[in-house]
Amino acid sequence: MFQYEALHVGCNRIPTAATWSSNLGLIYGAERLIAVADPFKEINYLMAGHSGRINCVCELATNSEYRSPFILSGASDKTLRLWQLEEEYFTCIKTIELEATVNCLCVNENLVVCGCSNSSCIVYSWNAEQRNLTEISRFTCSEIIPLEFAIVKLDHGIILTVCGSSKKIMVYGSDSAISSFKLKAVLRGHLDWVRTLSFKKTSGSTATLASGSQDRYIRLWNISLWGSEDEKVSEEFFESVLSNKPVRFTLGKIDLKIVFDALLMGHEDWVMSVDWHPTKEMILSSSADSSMIVWEPDTNTGIWVVTGRMGEMASSHGSTTATGSAGGFWGGLWNPNGNCVVCWGRTGGWRLWKQDAGQWLQLPSISGHTKSVKGVAWDPEGKFYLSAGTDQTTRLFARFKKDNAWHEMARPQIHGYDLTSISCMPSRIGFLSCADEKVSRVFKFPKTIVRLLYRLCDTNIGEESLPDAANVPLLGLSNKATTASETGTVNAEEVQTPVADVIGSLNHPPFEEHLQRLLLFPEVEKLFGHGYEVYACAISNNGNIAATSCKSQTPEHAVIRLYETQSWNQQQVLKGHSLTVTTIKFSPDDRYILSAGRDRLVCLHEQAENLLDYNNFASIKAHSRIIWDASWAPKEMGYFFATASRDKFVKFWKINDNKKICDVAALQFSDAVTAVDFAPFFHNDELLLAVGTEAGKIFIWRCPRENLTKWYPTRLPDHMAPMESINQILWKPTFETMGLYSLLIAGEDTSVRLLNVTLG
């Protein structure tokens, strides 16, 4: 009945937000969701349950008989959740309530350690057969808030290191997995907060700890047995090389020492993560300087050297954490085989490299929004879709013909305001978007992206009169078009800008750096007139008129402004509302403009004789609470539409032959209804209506076209549904097989979902 064809979410900006599992692939936190993905292709699962941001995830061991994967997650909602893959989806089988935000998790075989923002560290024993976490002990890191752990089991006991809001690294020890941890030593040397730790066990009694800090350096510490020769070294010698002084501690009945071994310098900003290679003596580090480095010891000298560097040069991104930047890479991971690395950054997108013949080759990966998605729009032919979110980006997704998966093919708009709505032009050459500003903006496809979509996705969009590419001027805020005339080239076919060179050579979905810089749409027009932030927008089905509304608390500003799309001049101002107009919809033949708003009114304006002007037709108080959305039925139904409201009703209305609005039927729900959309086609002579609620529930309602009072629902299963508000829901305008349709969903949970709906 239901199956997701595509899922898009970005990764949280936290170094502990992701892990790479040998069984499941990438596991990462996406705001309040947990995503499980194949980084080479697509997201396979999304799990909802936490009420706060996911800060850490890890995979737990399974027993030999029952190999169903387990995932443990911690979040700012002060809970740990245990998830198990049952049949075809993950289920939360246990929730542990804690006293503070969960910052980090660490797993070693059946031992799990959890760190919280109140400085408490809790140790659990994991039993896969009983599917249970049992608390063994807890202790408090009195001097720091833990941000990351590293744990190693040696022959004589267990060593747990803790880093966080301090220059120090705290070393705890336990004689066995069932005894409590005691503070054994404190490692000093870093000059700023230590952000990350990672252990490499080298023998039964030795290990190497890697630590990364905001001081931009990585330090290596060797743990080994305390020998008799250590007693003979004088204190005077230690004073002369203080940083190399061994730190002695007892684990069980054995004395061990920790010695600073090496200082790795290569990053130009905070070191966010360090990760040992699964089998080799190699370290992967990621940094806020937008680079990842692979370190290896030289075979002759033993000195650690850089053998691979991925990402960007520091000079190319300019700002650093010292200037308030939140850019760069937030974490890096090896895959379980050790031949691939991934990292994620501010935009939520993943970057992936694979080692081939000693060279690191970049491959396309997955991406998505990092904040709530407010609007989506379909290409009229269903070949691609657009999304707009409060992460201040609009994104274009299309199906890559080689792997048949939906990838982000362009990032048309990278804005300075949260996006609130988006509408695609019927001509397919561009779109209209609005944000938390008084201006709406019109964008058109550049030729580089038109050709990219044709080459990779078999999507044919006419490119006549389109600009070649787009860029953002150094001191500008708008995407500026670049054309042949501006380059001094007479023949437009001969124009080869750097953007055209790079994008024209792509035979795969673009990388994250392409999306951030080279795949912008040129902004061709700004639409002025509103006195407050623009809230909703729409374009008529014939493409001749654009309509916008803004936030308002007075009738003066609660208007719809119409713009003629040839010149983009304001054509008319439609009145009728007294508060914010939340949705604007043109009837299939553009004869009526339907609007609804916070004032609980539904207003209709009818087309005048000149076809560009509209006259006030009717205004009715349709609901008892704010009306969030409305939708027209297919044109064969006449003028039949639905409205959705916070009062938990969807109501159906029809303009009869006497030009009166009649109340036809109503559907009641258990939650506020936030999104509705009629399919623009019939299924076996039935109307199809998709409904989304504030609680994330999604319904498909069917109704015989001869009897508009009989509606039959089908509900999306809870494990597939978002857990937060549905901001917009849209049927794909086309289908290939009768009974197999697609539904596009914009969620407050940061996700864009493409759902396949199979009807009998």
Curated annotation (Swiss-Prot):
Gene Ontology biological-process entries:
protein transport; tRNA wobble uridine modification
Keywords, in A-Z order: Cytoplasm, Nucleus, Protein transport, Repeat, Transport, tRNA processing, WD repeat
Identify the metabolic or biological route this protein is part of.
tRNA modification; 5-methoxycarbonylmethyl-2-thiouridine-tRNA biosynthesis
Q: Which GO terms describe its cellular component?
A: cytosol; elongator holoenzyme complex; nucleus
Cellular localization per UniProt: Cytoplasm; Nucleus
Q: Which Pfam families match?
A: WD40
Q: Which InterPro entries match?
A: Elp2, G-protein_beta_WD-40_rep, Quinoprotein_ADH-like_sf, WD40/YVTN_repeat-like_dom_sf, WD40_repeat_CS, WD40_repeat_dom_sf, WD40_rpt
- WD-type repeats, residues: 49-93, 97-134, 139-182, 189-231, 266-305, 324-363, 368-407, 414-453, 576-615, 622-663, 668-711, 721-760
Q: Does the record's keyword annotation contain Repeat? A: yes
> What does the annotation say about its assembly with partners?
Component of the elongator complex.
Of which family is this protein a member? Belongs to the WD repeat ELP2 family.
Q: What does this protein do?
A: Component of the elongator complex which is required for multiple tRNA modifications, including mcm5U (5-methoxycarbonylmethyl uridine), mcm5s2U (5-methoxycarbonylmethyl-2-thiouridine), and ncm5U (5-carbamoylmethyl uridine). The elongator complex catalyzes formation of carboxymethyluridine in the wobble base at position 34 in tRNAs.
PANTHER family referenced in this protein's UniProt entry, alphabetically: ELONGATOR COMPLEX PROTEIN 2
Task: Let me see what the UniProt entry remarks about domains.
Answer: Folds into a two seven-bladed beta-propeller structure which is required for elongator complex assembly.
Instruction: State the name under which the record lists this protein.
Output: Elongator complex protein 2
